[in-house]
Amino acid sequence: TEHRMKEPFFVLATQNPFEMDGTYALPEAQIDRFFFKIVVDYPSESMLETILDQTTGAEITTGKQTITPQDILRFQQRVREVPIASHVRRAIARFVRSTLPSEPANPAAVREYVRFGISPRGAQAVVLAAKARALLDGRFNVSLDDVRFAVVPALRHRLQLNYRGAAEGLNVEEMLLELFDAQARAAIP
């Protein structure tokens, strides 16, 4: 059965730590469908007080609409219109390929510690996020800095370490940035 959802449609989800009872790992194919993984720190004491005030009192707090669905659709279309220079696109393609453990020329750390590299869907997420960041910064062109900004939130959940990499405590975010930086340096015209 297929149900057509009204546009724009997107889902925000939370991920509980695997250590919690009743929590199961998602298959890689499902993980890859999440555009971003944003890590939210535990609220500060003052923020926690605000949360308690706004959620446990008699007065019901409601949000205020600041953007319409049509605004979101227009922004999504505008993001897709942002051009990306060939050297930036090449850096992304080379970076994504550098995460594949099956490639003999890739760094030893990738071949030894990575179970699953970045998929084409991950590369698409990086491009779209970098384009959005450029627009939000008032520019109609994507820089390597925009791409670097997008790498961790768009890919931290997609690069899967193997057992050995996890056991040795490798940091996925650091690995992603190191791999991207190497390709970005090589791509500068």
Positions of PLM-derived features:
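Canonical AAA+ ATPase core
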Residues: 1-82, 131-133
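Short alpha-helical scaffolding segments that buttress acidic/His motifs in well-ordered protein cores
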Residues: 51-52, 92, 150-155
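Alpha-helix boundary/capping residues
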Residues: 55-58, 79, 95-99, 154, ...
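Conserved AAA+ ATPase small/helical "lid" subdomain
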Residues: 62-123
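C-terminal engagement/docking regions of AAA+ P-loop ATPases
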Residues: 101-189
